[in-house]
C-alpha cells in the first residue's frame, strides 16, 4: 500500500497555501488517492473536512465517523414498547384482561351504569308505580343485587333486614320521588340510588372512578 512522506506532504500544503495547516484536519481513508507521474508518487487530497480554528472537533463531525447503529435503535424501540405495555398494565391497563385489544374504560363504565340509571328512573317517573306501591319481585331483586350493595351506608340502611322496597316522596324535597326500604322492624328508610351508582363505579373501577364522576356527575340538589 502506498504511504505518504510527512515532509513531502507538508511541502505540498505549504506550496498551495501559505496559511498553516489546521490542527483539526480530518482525513478519511477514502479522501486520499495516488497517481504516478514520471516515476514520482504524488498525493491528491480531496473531501477534506476541517474543524474551526482554536476549537475542538464538533460532535456532528464525529458522528460522521460512526456507522449507523440500526440494532441499537431497534432495541430502543423494543424497550419503549415494553415500557408502554408495563405502564398500561400498572395504571389503567387500557388493555383488557385477555390482552386482545384496548379498552375504553369510560365507555365500559357507561355501559355498566347507564342501564341501571334508566332502570331506576323508569321505576320512579314512568307512572308504573304510585306512591306507596311495592316493587315487583323482579325489580326489587335487581335493586337488592345490583344497586343497594354499593351504597356507602348499605348495612345501616338495611338494618335488621329488608321487608320490601317501595316508592315515596323524599322527606326533605317536596314532590321529589325516591326509593325507600321498608325494614323488617317496620321502619322506612330512604336511600339515594345516585350514591349506589357512584359506589359501584368506585368498587369496580377504582383507578378511573374519581375522574369519571367529576366529568359525568353534576352536583345534585335532591337526594334522589
From Swiss-Prot:
Cellular location(s): Plastid, Chloroplast
Q: What coarse category fits the chief subcellular location reported for this protein?
A: plastid
GO BP terms: chloroplast organization; chloroplast rRNA processing
Q: Bias regions of kind Basic and acidic residues — which residues? A: 82-98
Family annotation (InterPro entries) = DCL-like
Top-level taxonomic group: Eukaryota
Q: Which UniProt keywords apply?
A: Chloroplast, Plastid, Transit peptide
Q: One Pfam family for this entry, by name? A: DUF3223
Sequence segments annotated as region (Disordered) = 76-98
Where in the sequence is the transit peptide found?
A: 1-50
- GO CC annotation: chloroplast
- Upon deletion of the gene, what happens? Embryonic lethality due to embryo development arrest at globular stage.
Function of this protein? Has a function in the early stage of chloroplast development and palisade cell morphogenesis. Required for correct plastid ribosome assembly. Required for processing and maturation of 4.5S rRNA.
Q: What name does the UniProt record give this protein? A: Protein DCL, chloroplastic
Query: What species is this protein from?
Result: Solanum lycopersicum
What is the organism lineage in this UniProt record?
Eukaryota, Viridiplantae, Streptophyta, Embryophyta, Tracheophyta
Instruction: Point out the gene that encodes the protein.
Output: DCL
